[in-house]
A protein has these predicted regions:
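Terminal amphipathic alpha-helical/low-complexity segments used for targeting or macromolecular assembly
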Residues: 1-59
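Flexible, glycine/small-residue-enriched loop-and-beta-strand segment within the central core
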Residues: 66-76, 81-130
Length: 130
């Protein structure tokens, strides 16, 4: 089983596995691009969100800055709105329904790690869906 498969299945996985880091960095680039789009260019913003998110509609709206780890594990329903500084650590699936409005400075975190420093330094994590 790959580290990616372990991550999605809720098993302990190596968070610094090169294949995972490649996907993380690719999503970071997409988020950076999204956050640089002019505030009134709604079409470009929506197109970029559709590249980032696993599922999004034409009426999906997120005020930048927006950050997520993988993006492809995030599914949002119709008429979704998130205000400034929305952060999603989507190591596991994140499913958000229709007509959801999220306030500023909200984070959704699926990733977990040990609180013991020695265990945490192994870079092992697990993730649970939200």
């Amino acid at each position: 089983m790959t580290e990616y498969e372990k991550m999605l299945s809720g098993e302990i996985y190596n968070a610094v596995d090169p294949s995972l880091l490649k996907d993380l960095y690719a999503c970071s680039e997409l988020c950076w691009e999204y956050n640089q789009i002019r505030p009134t260019d709604f079409k470009a913003r929506n197109e970029k969100l559709k590249q980032i998110l696993g599922e999004a509609d034409d009426d999906t709206f997120i005020n930048p800055p927006f950050h997520c780890d993988y993006g492809k594990h995030i599914k949002v329903g119709r008429r979704f709105f998130a205000n400034f500084n929305f952060v999603v650590l989507d190591e596991a699936p994140v499913t958000i329904g229709d007509d959801v409005f999220i306030g500023p400075n909200v984070g959704i975190y699926t990733a977990c790690h040990s609180t013991d420093p020695k265990e945490r330094n192994t870079r092992e994590e697990w993730a649970k869906p939200v």
